[in-house]
Amino acid sequence: MVFVECGAALKLNQCIYIGIASTICLLITQKANAQEKPVNTKNIGLITNIPRLSDIERPPTSVKDWLSQSAPTPPKIKITGVRINRTDDNFEIILETPDGEISAPETLQEGNIFIADIPNAVLALPEGKEFREDTPVDGISYVTVTQQESNNTVRVTIASSGKLPPIQVVNQSNGLTIALTPTSPDIELIVTAQKRPEDAQDVPLSLTVIPQQEIEDAQIRSFQDIANNTPNFSFLPTTAGSADFSYYSVRGLNNFNFLANQDTVGFYIDDVPFDYGGFLDVGLIDLERVEVLRGPQSTLYGRSSPAGVVNVISRPPSNQPEMRISALYGSYNNRELQLSLSDAIIPDKLAFRLAGAYNARDGVFDNTFLNKPIGERSQLTGRAQILWTPTPEWNISFNAYASDNDNGNPTFSRQNAENPFQVSQEVDGFHRLSTNTQALKISYNGDGFRATSITTRRFSNQNTLVGDNFPGDLLQQIIGINSTLWSQEFRLQSPESADRLRWLLGGYYESRNFNVLDDTFKYSDAGAVFFGLPASGSDRVSAEQNRHTYAIFGQIDYKPIAPLTLFAGWRYETADAELDRRRVFVNPDGTANPPTAEVRNATLNSDAFIPRFGLQYRFNPNLMAYATIAKGYRPSGFNYRADTEDTRRFQEETTWTYEAGLKSSWLDDRLSANLSIFQSDVDNYQVLLTDDFGFFRNVTNANVKVTGLEFELKANPLQGLDLIAGIGYVDSKFKNYRNSFTNRDFSNNRVPFAPELTYNLAVQYRSPGGIFARAELRGYGITYFDDANQVKQDPYALVNARIGYEGEKYGIYLYANNLFDTRYITSGFLFPPPNVTAGFGDPVTYGVRVSASF
């Protein structure tokens, strides 16, 4: 391939251009003889195109056959019961009869449908009912057992949401058993990244999917855990145990500019957009899967996201009684309890699901000044879901969830400290965050089209007190912020059965009220002297920002020939922003100086047309190539901390990303390997600047160029043995960037919080006897934490391990994280210059976890 041939001789960005051009040439010359793997998840109309076994034309019978047919017909066998038996490895459909063995059925498999017709049988269930169960296990849409009156047969129908797993039919002494063993990972990798159900290997973009079983095995409970299992995605807390703010980066673009109005990455939980990086510390519980889309996503999602999307999908309400519980205890008095339960209120019509979690941990830092541990944390999370399905075409769901975080002071140390977890500071601070969310989703899935409406409200409230982390108490920072976000998204799109032409049209509205109630630096007498102030006191800023965003978006996918798909998408977005802001200095006696730099009703508007183009070509059912060109966009905004008009506004940011990739699967889907290469050119990247004392007060714009690649591999070489690996490389550098306040030139410096290398490797084994073992390696390349590239973390790697025993309905596990107690920093800054003050990651931790399901 051209990717290998050009690697030694050319730079990565040159490889990208050659790769895209070669891919297009290869696609044009390839024969049109491959078909895309079919995926169908609709619960109605699936059997209409499958001929009845009795309707298939049979050859004329012979005299011998005619004579044999004249013999007395044996009595019909009554099927008096249908049971579903679930285990960790498979599930069984058991047909019970008091009359003895059931005749061997005729079977037919068509796409994702399996049919078994049992001759000379009658369905005699209580009250004469037929049997149906929706979603009996993950990956199976429904199971039905019905009477076929025309030919005295009983039909069993199994519909899979993806590829059918292996199915075995076994006659028993008192009935018939149909057993399904989902050994292929495809059954778990049906995704909705493009707002339609499809195999992850058919999606023409760089995509990481973490299915439910992997979520449990890797113990994914936060966005940081998701990033640890995703190439070119880093998610770093400010310091160990901290939840006040987390720095993330996808493909070299980060959220370091926390004064910006919109994040670079779109975070969604059950279709609800999250509005600010400081509000992302939510517990992720009772999940079905996670999808991480890298690259600009503006033509299929309500909110425009220039770097990518993290899409979290919770487990939906079940039509059958279900209960799960898990508990954990570990180092630093770490304790966790999770509970979820689900059942039908009205069978097949109305169901509910409840989930909740509590976790808490003592601080990992020892404060010798106060003689107590600090940096403790606690979190309480709850979620409630109601799902109403009045007809097979309609789904109406209401979700509500809330979280409450009460954490200790974010604690920092000198980067070169002998023991960074031992500090001496006077202030015992805190960080408190509470959020609540409500969402109403109405979906129609018809034969001619699909329609979706999503209405959401999200409220967040944050209060923080932070000391300077050193003896002497020079200053304290006090922050009080709340945010209310309303959004409405509507989508109209082609039906799931559409193949040659697929289309989507959507609209989006968002209203966000962001209130800075208090952003204060409180200086002591010593602090006033150190920072050159005339007297001690509190420098207080308050502000209110309102933003209204309107957008229309859409995409068309067209197949001119069977293996080739061309797609084009577009988005038009406009946003209006308004700012009120005041700054006062409050003296120690409580009197306030006259306000300075007061702003009222400042307004700005920005708009953009955002296109996306691409193609994909399926060489055969196991190999697909794609190439895309996409624009990303972040609107202009206000910096509420700025004192002057020329620094108060920053410009809109645009990104052009060029990407080419290959997706492949081998050995009956037991091995998958995906590769993508990309280049992003960013104009007016929104950059956060510090003043002479290291405080973040200003925002400017700079140009950035990013090149990189991602490679992911999953393998199941032996039954029970799984290998998961991923690696991402990114070269993200400033271009033509000079700090206008200090006149320092940062051109060709690396963008902060964007590790050059990210990698993850997991090897796990689950034995038939119940033994479970898993080892993980995750690492980062060199990472800088400032534009000047003066504060950095050298490459490092962490090792995690788990071992346990699993029964049919329970499990008990021992775990160790950061097994070799590696020291590393997750943030850093010059304070007071030239000293480096840093936040350190968690030390080694151990613990035990138990889980059970009912």
Curated annotation (Swiss-Prot):
It is found in: Cell outer membrane. Residues 199-315 form the TBDR plug domain. Disruption phenotype: Viable. Less sensitive to high iron and copper levels than wild-type. Secretes schizokinen even in the presence of iron when grown in BG11 medium or in BG11 without iron and copper as opposed to no secretion of schizokinen in wild-type under these conditions. Secretes schizokinen under iron-limiting conditions similarly to the wild-type. No effect on schizokinen-complexed iron uptake. Contrary to the wild-type, iron uptake is increased when grown in BG11 without iron and copper as well as in BG11 without iron, but addition of copper decreases iron uptake. A motif (TonB box) lies at residues 187-194. The keyword Ion transport applies. CDD domains: ligand_gated_channel (cd01347). SUPFAM superfamilies: Porins. InterPro entries: AMIN_dom (IPR021731), Plug_dom (IPR012910), TonB-dep_rcpt-like (IPR039426), TonB-dep_rcpt_b-brl (IPR000531), TonB_rcpt_b-brl_sf (IPR036942). PROSITE patterns: TONB_DEPENDENT_REC_3. It is a multi-pass membrane protein. A motif (TonB C-terminal box) lies at residues 839-854. Involved in the TonB-dependent uptake of copper and iron under conditions in which the concentration of copper exceeds that of the iron. This is Iron and copper transporter IacT. It comes from Nostoc sp. (strain PCC 7120 / SAG 25.82 / UTEX 2576). The lineage of its organism: Bacteria, Bacillati, Cyanobacteriota, Cyanophyceae, Nostocales.
